C-alpha cells in the first residue's frame, strides 16, 4: 500500500492530488508573513489546492557573511505561530541544529531538514523524536537511491511520517540540474515525494557573494515533475522577488503564481487519471 501522510484534513501521497508548499524564502516581518499567507490561502482555496505555508526564520547557509539570514528562531516562531492562529493553516519551516527541533515542533506541523544537512544523523534523530512529520531535502551531492539511508535513520529514530524533496543536483560549478528519474526512484522507497521547483533553478554562489537563479525555468520544471506523478510542489513566492532579502532570482512573483498552478492542476489530473 502506498504511503499517505495525513496532516489535519490534507492527505499527502504520490497518487493523490498534489499539495502546494509555498511562501517567501525567509520571514521578513509579521506584516509581510501575514500578507503572503493570506494571499496564498485565498489563491489555493480558489483553485482547491491543498496548501502548507513555508517560510524560514534563519537562512543559515548564505553564500556570504553579508547575506541577510533572517529574524532568528524566537521572533520567527512567534510570527509563524501568528500565521497559524490567524489562518488555521499548516506550517513548515527549516531546522538547522538539534537544539532547534523541540521549540520549532511546538509551533509548526512539519520540520524541514535542509539539503546540505540531509545526512546529519543527530539532526535527523532530534527531528524524528519530536513526532512531527519530517521532510528532508535530498542533498545536491546525493544520489536519489542513497535517500534510503536517510529513511532508515529516521525510521530507526521513530519517525512515522517522512517526506522527501528533490531540489536539483550539482552539475559542474555554480549550476544545478534536475533529473526527473530521481522523483520516481525516491517514490519507490514508499515515501511521498515533493519537487522544489524554485531551488532547482538556483545557481549556487553564481553571483560571487550570493546565489543566482533562472526563474524563467521554474514553471517548465514544475510541469515536468508533476508529470512524473508526485505528492507535492514546493515553490518560494514573493510579491517583489527582485528585492527580496534572499533567493530573489529563484522565487516566483506572486502575481504569476495563479497561471502556473492552473497548468499544474491540469498536468496532475492527466497523470493521475492514467
From Swiss-Prot:
The UniProt record lists the keyword Cytoplasm: yes
Enzyme class: transferase
Coiled coil: none
Keyword GTP-binding: no
Lineage: Bacteria, Pseudomonadati, Pseudomonadota, Alphaproteobacteria, Rickettsiales
Catalytic activity: D-arabinose 5-phosphate + phosphoenolpyruvate + H2O = 3-deoxy-alpha-D-manno-2-octulosonate-8-phosphate + phosphate
Designated name of the protein: 2-dehydro-3-deoxyphosphooctonate aldolase
SUPFAM superfamilies in UniProt: Aldolase (SSF51569)
Pathway: Carbohydrate biosynthesis; 3-deoxy-D-manno-octulosonate biosynthesis; 3-deoxy-D-manno-octulosonate from D-ribulose 5-phosphate: step 2/3; Bacterial outer membrane biogenesis; lipopolysaccharide biosynthesis
